């Protein structure tokens, strides 16, 4: 097994499978978590896991970096889009993927959805979907 595969397994184990207060901590106060719909599905997690090995590792590494730097993370890794919605930006060769997120109280970062970028601009439908998920999250968590 190559070094790259070992790193992929490490990221998968530590970021995807281990969620909760027992997760390893960085010297930051930020913690990324996946938005869950009413039926328990997690669109951003499902998107990341559906990617090929290299893109999956890149996206999981970016989630790690996002937890370390939080709202200080800038381009080329993160970009603000609209009304408090941000995108994590991953590129490998000509393949470009994005994961949408927003900041919540007490350093929580909520990853909402992801997509493969095909056009120059981020599709408005993806931003609208992230806003819809944020609205649902806030309603169910009593902060709207």
What are the residue ranges of the model-derived segments?
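Basic, Lys/Arg-enriched alpha-helical interface segments
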Residues: 1-96, 105-109, 118-144
């Amino acid at each position: 097994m190559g070094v790259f595969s070992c790193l992929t397994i490490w990221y998968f184990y530590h970021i995807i499978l281990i969620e909760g207060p027992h997760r390893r901590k960085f010297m930051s106060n930020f913690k990324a978590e996946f938005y869950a719909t009413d039926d328990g599905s997690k669109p951003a997690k499902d998107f990341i896991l559906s990617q090929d090995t290299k893109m999956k590792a890149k996206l999981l590494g970016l989630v790690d970096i996002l937890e370390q730097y939080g709202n200080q993370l800038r381009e080329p890794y993160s970009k603000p889009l609209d009304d408090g919605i941000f995108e994590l930006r991953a590129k490998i060769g000509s393949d470009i993927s994005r994961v949408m997120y927003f900041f919540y109280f007490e350093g929580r970062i909520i990853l909402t959805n992801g997509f493969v970028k095909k056009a120059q601009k981020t599709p408005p439908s993806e931003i609208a979907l992230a806003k819809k998920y944020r609205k649902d999250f806030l309603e169910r968590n009593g902060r709207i």
